[in-house]
Amino acid sequence: MEGDRHTPPAAASVSKVLDDDDLLVEILLHVGFPTTLVGAALVCKRWLGHASEPAFLRRFRELHPPRLLGFYIDDRYCDSAPPTFVRMLPQPAELSAIVRRTNFSPYRRLSPGMLDCRNGSVFVTLHTDKSALGVHRPLCHGGGLTVLPSLPRPQLPLGSSCSFRQVLSKEGDGLSYYYLYVESSNRESRMHVYMMQDGSWRRHHLLDIGQLPRPRSTPKAVLVGNKIYMAAGPSGILVLDLTTSGFSTVQLPQGVEHGSRGTTMLSRAGDASGVYLIHVKVFQLCIWLRKGGNWLPVDSICLHDMCANLSKSDSTIKDWHTVLLMDQVVDYGGFVFLQMGGCVLHLDIRCRTLRKVYEYRSTRYRDIHPFMMIWPPIFPALKYDPASNLKKKDTRKLMDCTCVVKLRRE
């Protein structure tokens, strides 16, 4: 009987929220993470409608930009060991269960090797065939490991070899996969562009690069909208427009060259409006945004004092006079990973803070693969609408959200 006395106030609170669209939207805006938003949207179709509305998602992203959850690194003594996942600390308690799903222990027998991370999807090669490709989606319920068909192997003419290859992906009406393969000889270069269609790789384009500068294997290429940006030559970028099948070239800002490994990096703009260029020379890190046909200066940071202070406070960091950009593909999010000696450093560009996040176990310094919170959220379809008969756990979820909004306002 005592429980009945508490039912009317709770029911009245729930009813008040369900009858007020503006209040409900305000609560959903403050759930904190896209994965939590998906859970809240499962309550009923009405909640799902609000949570999946484009204008709402734009506001949600402004309040909660995609978060760096950690990174994968292929730091292993033998090819049979799975990639290592390193969490970025601290992490909110709500994300603990999700981050636990990032490891590859269940797939150890397949000896996965890292290729890339993109918006919550992890691309790996599989030991059964180094051309076989697997996709792991830790942030999706029941994501598991999806095995894609083996990567194509073009038949090369005598005297030609593969000088560049990379798997790329993009979101749209589903997830699209592209595979770039450049064959080169002393006289010419050709680019094979494959696209995953109906469960198989199909050639999308076969293009002569001609007299254009050849793509470089580092820094890695990025796909922005329908254009692929590839570092090429000593100081250029080769741009492939997938819509027109045409190439164009872009020169780096004056005085900037790709140089040796760890000098430049390309990064996608989060809204797919352009591409960022990040350049390190000695201790100077500079950032530009390519937009409207011009390079726009974004930021410039002197790393000397930060590196010196970090070396003094941590005796494990050696050779602090050499700072390199780690080859990484990620949407520009105000951070970058650097390599100094045998350590991985995380530079928060906005806060101007530098910290060590990993120390290599082997002397083979592999690439790093940042793992970001998924965006936009993937909402499942609801087969029925329980809005008129909410379960107790849904009521508790609503009350928790209401408390979060109240506390943040105070």
Predicted ranges, named:
Residues 1-410:
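N-terminal entry/capping and adjacent linker segments that precede and initiate structured domains
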